[in-house]
Amino acid sequence: MADNMTTTQIEWRMKKMAIGSSTHSSSVLMKDIQSQFEQLKLRWESYPNLVKSTDYHQKRETIRLATEELYLLSKRIDDSILFHKTVIANSSIIADMIVSLSLLETLYEMKDVVEVYSRQCL
């Protein structure tokens, strides 16, 4: 099957796979971030009790862990935003795909015209 495909068809198929993997990565990334956020939210509900503790070291460690978790989650969200900007900025993939499809459609129309013309001439 691949032997019969034109270069344009192969390029289009490769670009389609690239877009699909970007979309899948985006979806997985967002689900992971949402899950991490929910876990953090559950832990934060128990933090006030720990912070009320009289044990200074436990208090300090709790605050340190909470701060670290918030930082890591915010970093992941920043990375996610950057990833989405990259995918959006890479809309040239979509533009290229549309151009490829247009060219392919035009080529098929030209092929049909040539076939009709050649039949009339023969």
Swiss-Prot record:
Keywords, alphabetical: Host nucleus, Host-virus interaction, Transport, Virion
The UniProt subunit note reads as follows: Interacts with protein M1. May interact with host nucleoporin RAB/HRB and exportin XPO1/CRM1.
Record motif Nuclear export signal, residues: 10-19, 86-95
What the entry lists under InterPro entries is as follows: Flu_NS2 (IPR000968)
Give the originating organism: Influenza B virus (strain B/Lee/1940)
Keyword Transport in the entry? The reply is: yes
Q: Name one GO biological process term.
A: exit of virus from host cell nucleus through nuclear pore
Q: What does this protein do?
A: Mediates the nuclear export of encapsidated genomic RNAs (ribonucleoproteins, RNPs). Acts as an adapter between viral RNPs complexes and the nuclear export machinery of the cell. Possesses no intrinsic RNA-binding activity, but includes a C-terminal M1-binding domain. This domain is believed to allow recognition of RNPs bound to the protein M1.
What is a single cellular component term in the Gene Ontology annotation? Answer: host cell nucleus
Main subcellular location? virion
Indicate the family of this protein. Answer: Belongs to the influenza viruses NEP family.
Q: What is this protein called?
A: Nuclear export protein
Where in the cell? Virion; Host nucleus
